[in-house]
């Protein structure tokens, strides 16, 4: 989740229930994303709100994480409220928009 973005940020920590993979993807932590995937975490897992790691990385501008997740089989067409591409477009993440459109 990105501050001041389309995706609503919870008012307090009790409302925040990110999975490990979504958390690391939203932080741009490539090594931690790789470790989570190596430990068997489903690349398409979502948090309680249906927010995926690919959506998190795309919205927050982490192209390296987006590419890694796609290489590992992330569903680029998955749509919770928005697709990863739609979130990248709303957040004006140009490189990620171009990459996702090229797939």
Show which residues each predicted segment covers:
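Conserved ankyrin/ankyrin-like repeat signature
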Residues: 32, 64-65, 95-96
């Amino acid at each position: 989740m990105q501050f001041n973005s389309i995706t609503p940020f919870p008012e307090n920590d009790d409302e925040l229930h990110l999975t490990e993979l979504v958390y690391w993807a939203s932080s741009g932590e490539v090594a931690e994303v790789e470790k989570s995937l190596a430990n068997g975490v489903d690349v398409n897992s979502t948090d309680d709100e249906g927010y995926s790691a690919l959506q998190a990385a795309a919205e927050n501008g982490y192209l390296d994480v987006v590419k890694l997740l796609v290489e590992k089989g992330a569903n680029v067409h998955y749509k919770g409220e928005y697709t990863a591409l739609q979130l990248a477009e709303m957040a004006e993440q140009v490189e990620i928009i171009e990459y996702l459109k090229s797939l």
